Amino acid sequence: MRAATLYRYSIPMEAGVILRHQRLKSRDGLLVKLQQGEQTGWGEIAPLPEFSQETLPEAQAAAIAELQRWVNGEELDLGPLPSVAFGLSCALAELEKLLPLSADYHKAPLCTGDPDELFAVLQALPGEKVAKVKVGLYEAVRDGMIVNVLLEALPDLKLRLDANRSWTRAKADGFAKYVNPELRSRIAFLEEPCKTRAESREFARDTGIAIAWDESVREADFQVEAEPGVAAIVIKPTLVGSIARCQQLVQQAHQAGLEAVISSSIESSLGLTQLARLADWLTPATVPGLDTLSLMQAQCIRQWPDSTLPVVTVDQLDVLWHS
């Protein structure tokens, strides 16, 4: 006997969370629960505004159609919408006990640029000292100076930087000019510095700063391949698709000698804990990029270890559909 329920959550965000062009006041998404006999599986479907190709209403309609088919005994067709494919594949993997329970709760902390604050966070971290800095929100020169200060102050630090394609080539060069060439090798990678792949490749070649593909991974013409100056691909499952698609990308990256980094799209704590399990399974040697829970004012159903945020329980969620 199969049963399914679709819930909706809305979690207030901390003030000042800005996506590309808009402030995110709340994180809204769907949670799916599949039940078959004694087994239960959960998944999260949460398109990210400005980044996902689908809207939440589109994801909701597609999810309900799929759940209806599944309850009627058909196989789940994960469909073309990445957030729906990822959420349903997680629920199915939990139901069938295919998603391992062990998780990698290490995370590359998101850093605002204060070396003292970052030093305190990193001192408490076991293993590799990796942090992430968002660049491209302010002046490129300011970003370069902050990165240089962090690398100088913390000699065992490696930085991941994310520019979200926000720079012209001239601005990217302005950033690089303020990062001491001797420190650049400790930039693990800079995600998509320029507006085009060609400009980003040229930037890596001319500055010696390694880059990673992020937005490109979701584009139809993208091929995972080894190329000079490219160190990694960033996999955001909510934006990429099913667990199987994520596995495929990880395998292709490793075959090409690239690092694959599982990364958050600001999912709730339920989705984040699943990403931690996915990272431990598929990319055990790489610290995942999951430090987004602090952007929220609450957790949802499942707790992230050590988080003191209040937890929204299943009884507090709106039921959108139930079989």
UniProtKB/Swiss-Prot annotation:
Gene (name only): menC
Gene Ontology terms for molecular function: magnesium ion binding; O-succinylbenzoate synthase activity
Location of the active site: K134 (proton donor), K236 (proton acceptor)
Catalytic activity reported: (1R,6R)-6-hydroxy-2-succinyl-cyclohexa-2,4-diene-1-carboxylate = 2-succinylbenzoate + H2O
One BP annotation, GO: menaquinone biosynthetic process
EC number(s) from the headed UniProt entry: 4.2.1.113
Pathway: Quinol/quinone metabolism; 1,4-dihydroxy-2-naphthoate biosynthesis; 1,4-dihydroxy-2-naphthoate from chorismate: step 4/7; Quinol/quinone metabolism; menaquinone biosynthesis
Organism the protein comes from: Yersinia enterocolitica serotype O:8 / biotype 1B (strain NCTC 13174 / 8081)
Coiled coil: none
SMART domains, sorted: MR_MLE
Protein name: o-succinylbenzoate synthase
Highest taxon above the source species: Bacteria
Family designation: Belongs to the mandelate racemase/muconate lactonizing enzyme family. MenC type 1 subfamily.
Lineage start: Bacteria, Pseudomonadati, Pseudomonadota, Gammaproteobacteria, Enterobacterales
